[in-house]
Amino acid sequence: MIDKYLKETCMLDYSNPAIQELIQKMKWKELDEFERIKAIYNFVRDDILFGYNEDDAICASKVLFDGYGQCNTKGTLFMALLRACQIPCRIHGFTIDKRLQKGAMTGLVYRSAPQNIFHSWVEVYFENQWYELEGFILDQAYLNKLQNQFPNCKGAFCGYGVAVKDFRNPTIDFNRNSTYIQSEGITQDFGVYYCPDDLLKEHHQQMSRLKGFAYRHIGRHFMNRNVKRVRQR
């Protein structure tokens, strides 16, 4: 039963040479299961920077090539690396309130964005239980800069890709626990799926063709510029 959560798919293309080369270079398969999950998690969180790709449906190897991603795309890469290293995983789909993206989204891009934005996290099967892992979305360097930008915020925070109850101490480190960074912004729950391919067949970002074109070619570049400004402060 659990074996299906190890299978390769079109989006989880872990036989891709670039992914296999990365796994060999990082020597993840030589680690015990806990350290393997933790090392892959930290790589996806901190080495794949927070940013906005052209589409949620890109494959894992494209996310690796881009070197950046958001919840859905970083999740795709995370799942591919986990499965390639014999760690069972699945995906859980949601929507989040667009207020969570304010700051990364600004001006017309924010005003024209759908109220509910497609979202997902990865669930990992380890020691006979499923862990909900969402805290890999923002790299630590970006989060640190954001915390420095809002030094007086001691409690809940919503914006710039964050929705948490404790802004100063979000649960983003995996140590046999679930991790979260956007969960306080969830508005709808679509349930769990075997792979992102299946999730996206049933649920995806609702927007017109024109808005989709504008996002891919204009909007996301403004958003990535806003993220870059936070990093440079």
Name each region found by the language model:
Residues N42-F43, A80, A84, S120, ...:
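Residue-level signal for well-ordered alpha-helical scaffold segments within enzymatic catalytic domains
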Residues G51-I117:
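Active-site neighborhood of thiol-dependent amide/isopeptide-bond enzymes
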Residues I2, K7, M11-Y14, I96-R233:
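His-Asp-centered catalytic microenvironments across diverse enzyme cores
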Residues I23, L82, C89-I91, L133, ...:
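Generic structural hydrophobic/aromatic packing signal, biased to beta-strands
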Residues M1-D66:
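Secondary-structure boundary elements
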Residues K27-E30, F78, W121, F126:
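Functionally constrained cores in energy, signaling, and assembly domains
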